[in-house]
A protein has these predicted regions:
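Conserved alpha-helical scaffold flanking the Walker A/P-loop in AAA+ ATPase domains
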Residues: 318-339
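Walker A/P-loop
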Residues: 257-296
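Inter-Walker segment of RecA-like/P-loop motor cores
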Residues: 302-311, 318-319
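Walker B catalytic acidic pair
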Residues: 343-344
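Basic, amphipathic alpha-helical bundle interface domains used for macromolecular binding and assembly
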Residues: 67-75, 90, 97-107, 326-327, ...
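Peripheral, non-AAA+ core regions of ATP-driven protein-machinery
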Residues: 2-9, 14-18, 22-256, 260, ...
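Short beta-strand elements
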Residues: 45-54, 320, 423-430
Length: 552
């Protein structure tokens, strides 16, 4: 064995050559290597570093860095997978460190970077190339690279560091393409990852193109046709409800529908996405990153349509807001930039409904958990549908068999503060049967002013007016205007002020209620192409503000 002489504690000692790596100030040689990786902490993505040190000593495999069980279990997965590619772990002391050490590492995305950094320390791949490489992916026992969640969100964070290349699972390649013009390579196996790292720059570029073409060809046949919302023209009658839906879509207002069973409340809600304005590219990236972190991004493609989330009435508080020590996105976050539809709203538990009050007001949800405090986006439009009583036919006493106390208890699940945040309330009554026999041809649907095509055009025009009004500032829908912005963008004349004062005294409106009436009136004026809010606009807003529709 090669030995060297070193002064230790004033004494001359003959030491094995490889012990030099254990003393401060000496070079570690090729037994140390580092690679970049990505992780998720709730919805927040971050760039991590994976370091490995292989030194002489009793054979062991230590992993440090505040790791969750999913990351620690990678030890056995990697032991078997590396053996499958004839790169078994050396019978030495292996220490893997994950930084930053102050963040809990969870998920299986650290498998691939850990495997690559061990291979580099063994000399299987060039260690210097890993310093500019970013990698995530789960490694199976057969050395295949499997899909992980949150790749799109992690790529957004990694893009700020401008790495030379990005290595992800082939199944996540759609998210890599959606992240922008990044040099992203999708690999199917650990051997393919090694081949990519060992290749030249020109060869790597060719491999990236081939992987993208292969992914496009595989997903092209499986692409589903775009799901279209039902057309509003298919709804018979319901002019007031259609008007309320158009106002809600134009200004991002909350809407409550009440009426007997079978009157079309749910059908109207399903039609609403068909008249909503399209998302901007920034909103598509934002919403897609949320769904990627939740593991619900289909085919890794950017979400094109606004989310429409409809939880079951048995959903718990944690399902609505997000559950877990590091909470996953709940229903309110999945509905971000879209619609949260609560069918049979009075069947939800009251505490489940009351947690909606904060995100309805602020557009985000604050969660306090054992591992920290989290703030998730939750800017949605709430759409509720409910029956007026347990049987659904109140106040028709010919059909309703509910006692007064039963009706009161049933409606009491909708608290006053929650109802005060509903901008629009609309009662839907039974439609006469003769409406069903009216002619419904395709040409009629296209030309009908109550059809989705015409309504969508009106909504887009109203949104353009809002955008022009907020020119030079961040675009905000009328339903999201702050009190200061209401004074700036929604001025009232003397006649309108007197009208609103009298109406608010008669209806007992709160200050928040008055603000919401002004917001709705501003949207109605935008739909009619008016620059100023008139008395007629305030009157229509007050008509839809009537919250006694549940008891009429």
């Amino acid at each position: 064995m090669v030995k060297t002489v070193m002064i230790v504690g004033g004494q001359r000692k003959n030491l094995p050559f490889f012990w030099l790596a254990e003393f401060p100030g000496t070079e570690r040689g090729k037994m140390y290597c580092q690679i970049n990786a990505g992780g998720l902490y709730g919805l927040q993505s971050y760039v991590a570093q994976v370091e490995v040190d292989i030194s002489k000593g009793l054979p062991c495999f230590d992993m440090v860095g505040l790791l969750d069980s999913e990351v620690r279990e990678a030890r056995e997965r990697l032991r078997v997978s590396l053996h499958h590619i004839n790169a078994a772990l050396p019978a030495e002391k292996i220490t893997v460190n994950y930084s930053p050490a102050g963040i809990v590492k969870s998920g299986t995305s650290f498998d691939l970077p850990t495997a690559l950094v061990i291979l580099a320390a063994q000399g299987k791949v060039p260690p210097e190339r890993l310093k500019e490489l970013w990698a995530v992916g789960e490694v199976g026992l057969d050395a295949r690279i499997k899909q992980v969640r949150g790749v799109l969100a992690m790529l957004h964070a990694a893009n700020q560091s401008a790495f030379r290349s990005y290595l992800i699972p082939f199944e996540n390649l759609g998210e890599g393409i959606a992240a922008g013009k990044l040099p992203v390579m999708g690999v199917c196996s650990l051997e393919e990852a090694m081949e990519y790292v060992n290749a030249s720059a020109q060869e790597q570029e060719r491999m990236r193109r081939d992987a993208e073409d292969r992914w496009q060809s595989q997903t092209k046949g499986g692409m589903e046709k775009e799901k279209k919302a039902p057309d509003f023209a298919l709804l018979c009658g319901m002019e007031e409800a259609k008007r309320a839906a158009m106002i809600a879509a134009a200004g991002a207002h909350n809407l409550l529908l009440a009426g007997p069973p079978g009157t079309g409340k749910t059908m109207l809600a399903r039609c609403l996405p068909g008249i909503l304005p399209p998302m901007s590219e920034e909103e598509k990236q934002e919403v897609s990153a949320i769904y990627s972190a939740a593991g619900q991004l289909e085919d890794g493609r950017l979400i094109q349509e606004r989310p429409f989330v409809s939880p079951h009435h048995t959903a718990s508080v944690y399902a609505m807001t997000g559950g877990g020590a590091v909470p996953k996105p709940g229903m309110v976050t999945l509905a971000h930039r879209g619609v949260l539809f609560l069918d049979e709203m009075t069947e939800f538990k009251r505490q489940t409904l009351d947690v909606l009050r904060q995100p309805m007001e602020e557009g985000k949800i604050f969660l306090a958990r054992s591992r920290g405090n989290f703030v998730y986006p939750a800017d949605f439009m709430l759409l509720g549908a409910t029956n007026p009583c347990p049987c659904g036919y109140y106040p028709d006493r010919n059909r309703c068999r509910c006692q007064d106390w039963e009706v009161h208890r049933y409606l009491a699940r909708l608290s006053g503060p929650l109802l005060d945040r509903m901008d629009l309330c609309c009662q839907i009554k039974q439609t006469p049967i003769r409406k069903l026999w009216e002619k419904r041809e395709a040409s009629y649907i296209d030309s009908d002013k109550n059809g989705s095509k015409w309504m969508r055009e009106q909504v887009l025009e109203a949104r353009k007016r809002q955008q022009m009004r907020c020119r030079g500032a961040a675009m905000r829908e009328n339903g999201r205007l702050s009190p200061g912005e209401i004074l700036k963008y929604c001025p009232l004349g003397l006649e309108e002020q007197e009208f609103l004062e009298q109406a608010s005294e008669q209806a007992g409106l709160s200050m928040r209620g008055c603000h919401r009436v002004i917001r709705v009136a501003r949207t109605i004026a935008d739909l009619e192409g008016k620059d100023r809010i008139g008395v007629e606009h305030l009157g229509q807003a007050l008509f839809f503000r009537n919250q006694n529709v549940l008891r009429e």
